[in-house]
Design a protein with these regions (language model features):
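A conserved pocket-lining segment of Rossmann-fold NAD(P)-dependent short-chain dehydrogenase/reductase
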Residues: 1, 55-61, 102-103, 110-132, ...
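Conserved Rossmann-fold NAD(P)-dependent oxidoreductase catalytic core, especially the SDR/UDP-sugar
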Residues: 2-62, 89
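Conserved cofactor-binding/catalytic machinery of classical short-chain dehydrogenase/reductase
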Residues: 11-14, 70-71, 133-136
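Active-site Tyr-X1-5-Lys
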Residues: 21, 58-89
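Conserved sequence/active-site signature of Rossmann-fold short-chain dehydrogenase/reductase
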Residues: 36-37, 96-98, 137
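Glycine/proline-rich active-site loop of Rossmann-fold NAD(P)-dependent oxidoreductases
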Residues: 82-86, 98-111, 144-154
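Mid/C-terminal beta-alpha module of Rossmann-like enzyme folds, strongest
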Residues: 140-201, 222, 231-248
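Active-site loop of classical SDR/Rossmann-like NAD(P)-dependent oxidoreductases
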Residues: 163, 204-217, 235
């Protein structure tokens, strides 16, 4: 609660209170996440849209999703409460790759790549990664200031890659990194996931491993006129800056 949910909720409450106090803010773009949309019991092969909410997230089963959906609810309730509110849009990125600006950025979405390039994991696990480039996320935020619907909800997702695909791409483009080649069998990954990452519990593994989920980002393409860097390009273009930052 204190580490994940409270910072998101209290921080968002502070932001909207500051907007009201200032009285001069005309446009507000709230950075949310696909985690605010993805329910716990999604179906393999399902495509999700912004019509869905992660309202089944709890502190026990999905604290990050709870943090994101709670913060967005605060924003939307505030926005609908009375006249004179600024224009408001929410942006929902998936896993964000692309060149990092500082070492702290390697602790988030790029930890997936960092684990590969530093060979923190000897074998690969059978998992799909939904990807968007950080530069596209930034562009979507700028466009949402003046484009799209007031109160709009926009997914920013360029595509997806299997973890094994990502590792293969890195081996092809940066052979000196010697990223892992072999995948661990599903059943072993299912029961021994914490050996690869302490965050991989049995329930999480059962929900995500060897399953695919897709996202409909066409509203952002249509209403924000977005086009996307390919997932592969985002992977490849992430690495040089990671090397420059001294993490590889």
């Amino acid at each position: 609660q204190r580490q994940i949910v409270d910072p998101s909720v209290i921080g968002t409450q502070n932001v909207v209170a500051a907007i009201d106090a200032a009285g001069t803010v005309e446009r507000f773009v709230h950075t949310s996440s696909t985690a605010a949309i993805r329910p716990i019991n999604w179906k393999n092969g399902q495509t999700l849209t912004t019509e869905t909410w992660a309202d089944d997230a709890t502190l026990e089963n999905n604290p990050y999703g709870l943090a994101k959906v709670s913060a967005e609810r605060i924003v939307r309730e505030w926005h609908s409460d009375g006249e004179g509110k600024p224009r408001m849009v929410t942006i929902h990125p998936s896993v964000v790759f692309g060149p990092p600006m500082s070492k702290v950025h390697l602790r988030g979405s790029l930890s997936f790549l960092n684990a590969l390039v530093q060979r923190k994991i000897p074998l690969l696990i059978p998992i799909q990664i939904n990807i968007v480039d950080v530069r596209d996320v930034a562009e979507a935020h700028v466009r949402a200031l003046t484009m799209g619907q007031n109160g709009g909800r926009y997914l920013t997702v360029s595509g997806d890659m299997q973890f094994s695909e990502i590792s293969k791409t890195l081996r092809e483009e940066y052979p000196e990194l010697k990223t892992p080649r072999f995948s661990v069998p599903y059943l072993i990954a299912l029961f021994f996931g914490p050996l690869f990452d302490k965050r991989i519990t049995y329930s999480w593994a059962k929900q995500h491993l060897k399953r695919n989920l897709y996202w409909d980002a066409t509203p952002a393409e249509r209403e924000l006129e977005m086009s996307w860097k390919s997932a592969r390009d985002s992977v490849v273009e992430s690495v040089p800056k990671m090397v420059e930052l001294g993490r590889v």
